[in-house]
């Protein structure tokens, strides 16, 4: 955005869909771009509480369900972020896909079309799981990019890994930046050398409360059945590993579908 000058008197106007606690705003704070959050869209109670704790000044600007938003009533904005639910793309979920009209959570991506056509924001930012561009799902992604091109956007996308940008986690995600009209060519940031690694953070002795008990594992497995019955959510997939106890790290892919 170096070509565009945003100041305290002329801040970047932002709308975040599927906001969560709005890591997008945290990023803008970190890189020092003045902005105003003209609106956000979130329905998860816990995420809303976290958002309001971080940004109390914007507590009254949550537009709720994206399907119900009348975009004519929303102030104009320059940046639209739309990291729609990954539940039905993710390898940790049921991979039901996100075809338009399918009713899956991931199909909410197509609801963003209304916002883009009505407000024509200068910048779009999408982040989602790597599976979005796998062989099974990339036709949906390509169709979406083609639509954006029809609307006048140029798209730049890349699979990026958190470990290449200063975070000691192997976390690959798809990022897509779309720019409306004439603009300077966008370049994704170059990878950085990782200075902090997981071994620098983990404690040599771990309290028992951080180790999953047999009872907890059984509870997670039962929770799987509820998700499967509803056709939603991530699944808990325990894996037996033959490692010395001091080398084991207990994790799960349990989630609430967000």
Q: Where do the PLM segments sit?
A:
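Nucleotide donor/acceptor-binding cores
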Residues: 12
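Class I S-adenosyl-L-methionine
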Residues: 69-79, 89-258
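Short glycine-/small-residue-rich Rossmann-like dinucleotide-binding loops
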Residues: 84-85
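SAM cofactor-binding core of SAM-dependent methyltransferases
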Residues: 15-67
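Short, functionally important structural connectors and interaction interfaces within domains
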Residues: 20, 35, 58, 81, ...
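Alpha-helix termination/capping residues and helix-transition junctions
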Residues: 8, 32-34, 74, 118
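A short, basic/flexible loop-to-alpha-helix module at the beginning of a structural domain
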Residues: 1-9
């Amino acid at each position: 955005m170096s070509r565009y000058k945003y100041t305290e008197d002329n801040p970047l106007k932002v709308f975040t869909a599927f906001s969560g606690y709005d890591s997008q705003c945290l990023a803008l704070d970190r890189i020092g771009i003045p902005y105003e959050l003209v609106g956000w869209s979130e329905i998860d109670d816990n995420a809303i509480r976290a958002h309001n704790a971080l940004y109390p000044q914007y507590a009254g600007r949550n537009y709720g369900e994206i399907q119900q938003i009348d975009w004519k009533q929303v102030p104009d904005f320059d940046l639209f972020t739309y990291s729609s639910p990954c539940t039905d793309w993710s390898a940790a979920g049921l991979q039901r896909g996100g075809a338009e009209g399918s009713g899956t959570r991931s199909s909410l991506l197509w609801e963003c079309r209304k916002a883009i056509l009505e407000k024509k924001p200068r910048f779009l930012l999408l982040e989602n799981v790597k599976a979005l561009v796998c062989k099974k799902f990339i036709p949906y992604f390509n169709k979406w990019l083609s639509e954006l091109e029809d609307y006048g956007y140029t798209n730049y996308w890349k699979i990026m890994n958190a470990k290449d940008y200063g975070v000691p986690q192997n976390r690959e995600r798809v990022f897509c930046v779309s720019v409306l009209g004439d603009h300077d060519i966008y370049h994704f940031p170059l990878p950085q050398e990782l200075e902090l690694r997981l071994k620098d953070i983990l404690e040599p002795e771990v309290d028992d409360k951080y180790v999953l008990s047999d009872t907890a594992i059984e509870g997670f497995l039962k929770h799987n059945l509820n998700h499967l019955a509803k056709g939603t959510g991530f699944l808990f997939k325990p894996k037996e590993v033959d490692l010395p106890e001091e080398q084991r790290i207990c994790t799960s892919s349990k989630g609430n579908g967000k």
